Amino acid sequence: MAKRIASMSSLLLIALLCLSSHLAQAQVLFQGFNWESWKKQGGWYNFLHGHVDDIAATGVTHVWLPPPSHSVAPQGYMPGRLYDLDASKYGTGAELRSLIAAFHSKGIKCVADIVINHRCADYKDSRGIYCIFEGGTPDSRLDWGPDMICSDDTQYSNGRGHRDTGADFGAAPDIDHLNTRVQTELSDWLNWLKSDVGFDGWRLDFAKGYSAAVAKTYVDNTDPSFVVAEIWSNMRYDGNGEPSWNQDGDRQELVNWAQAVGGPASAFDFTTKGELQAAVQGELWRMKDGNGKAPGMIGWLPEKAVTFIDNHDTGSTQNSWPFPSDKVMQGYAYILTHPGVPCIFYDHVFDWNLKQEISTLAAVRSRNEIHPGSKLKILAAEGDVYVAMIDDKVITKIGTRYDVGNLIPSDFHVVAHGNNYCIWEKSGLRVPAGRHHY
């Protein structure tokens, strides 16, 4: 009897380990704000709190929330007093903590938008330059002076800091992340966001502004469960203004960063976004590279790629690099069934009324246990059609072509479809075998 109990206990332990491993892999990120969210009457945190159930129903595992601190710009991307959460235009610190607790009650982890490349000062120094920073506490934490600004940021620096390790940000002082006090106090602040506020991970804003080695320092010092960096890489374009077919240099930058930082660090797959939004306009041949793989970061390092259709910068009211609006669901059909970690944008679920279609695709992903490292086999990539099989369990078709011939095995059945996309899986509603037209 004791042996049977021990055996059953071992089997249960193995099952739990397998389940936890799967849950750790099966990630779907949701961006819980847009560029105008700060304007919401009654506060964005309170508004979003009322939609936690709706967001959970889409099947997401993580929600990305806006920058939490005081900021000169209302959206939060020009931060000043980092510990001052009550000065945020999105709501108070108490409202933020309540929102995070509500997401946690649904099993959803919360990712903070971390803006540390640059920082806005409260006061001028003797030179008349804004470079005296306040941390937002009664003590001296994050109370910095010009010594903490990169020496080559000559508009603000006193010349005593280290040179910048990344790209320049002209609108505010670039912080010297090689300064040991800066590293210590920012790490302490991040750990406070975890232990006191409740955040689980980080989205690193403008991560090109400091080196991967600097990012690694903060990741190692704070042990987040999820990290994704914004590295808006520069795609190559041909003379006609169209994206080049080969974007290896673009995606190599993303791969290099993720590998250098290590641990849980991933990067937004800007390469896939650029290729996909060009491809859905009659150029679906773009979605297979010279080695038969996906052309974006997911073709090389899918486990560290976060795919997306639009965000608060590329879409929303900024609209700086938008996905074709009439083809957004083709984009979601791709990212929600393919390797990588897909990110769903708030606007598309709520403002565009695409919640049901997106939720259906997310359910296909969950039901078939598609994960960041899932196996991708591209069956067709031509101008008007793209067909791919994922983990031998799901087939995705996007494009205008009506007849996909015999590419769909007879034991696959339609489980989702919409404007110029269709999804099949090995279980579900049975349809007649033979040729398929969608």
UniProtKB/Swiss-Prot annotation:
UniProt-annotated binding residues for Ca(2+) 2: E134, T137, D139, D143
Reactions it catalyzes: Endohydrolysis of (1->4)-alpha-D-glucosidic linkages in polysaccharides containing three or more (1->4)-alpha-linked D-glucose units
Cofactor(s) in the UniProt record: Ca(2+)
Organism of origin: Oryza sativa subsp. japonica
Annotated site location: Transition state stabilizer: D313
Job of this protein: Important for breakdown of endosperm starch during germination.
Cofactor binding note of this UniProt entry: Binds 3 Ca(2+) ions per subunit.
Pfam families, alphabetized: Alpha-amyl_C2 (PF07821), Alpha-amylase (PF00128)
Sites where the protein binds substrate: 70-72, 77-78, 203-208, 232, 234, 252, 293, 299-301, 312, 318, 397, 402-404, 414-420, 424
Extra facts: Binds starch not only at the active site, but also via accessory binding sites on the protein surface that are important for efficient binding to starch granules and thereby increase enzyme activity.
Expression sites by tissue: Germinating seeds.
GO terms for biological process, alphabetical: starch catabolic process; sucrose catabolic process
Active site, per annotation: D205 (nucleophile), E230 (proton donor)
Record-listed Ca(2+) 1 binding positions: N117, D164, A167, D174, G209
InterPro entries reported for this sequence: A-amylase_bs_C (IPR012850), A-amylase_pln (IPR013775), Alpha_amylase (IPR006046), Glyco_hydro_13_cat_dom (IPR006047), Glyco_hydro_b (IPR013780), Glycoside_hydrolase_SF (IPR017853)
Quaternary structure annotation from Swiss-Prot or TrEMBL: Monomer.
Keyword entries, A-Z: Calcium, Carbohydrate metabolism, Glycosidase, Hydrolase, Metal-binding, Signal
Keyword match Hydrolase: yes
Molecular function via GO: alpha-amylase activity; calcium ion binding
Protein family per UniProt: Belongs to the glycosyl hydrolase 13 family.
SMART domains: Aamy (SM00642), Alpha-amyl_C2 (SM00810)
Signal peptide start and end residues: 1-26
Gene that encodes the chain: AMY1.6
UniProt: Ca(2+) 3 binding residues: D153, D168, F169, A172, D174
Protein name as catalogued: Alpha-amylase isozyme 3B
Enzyme Commission identifier(s): 3.2.1.1
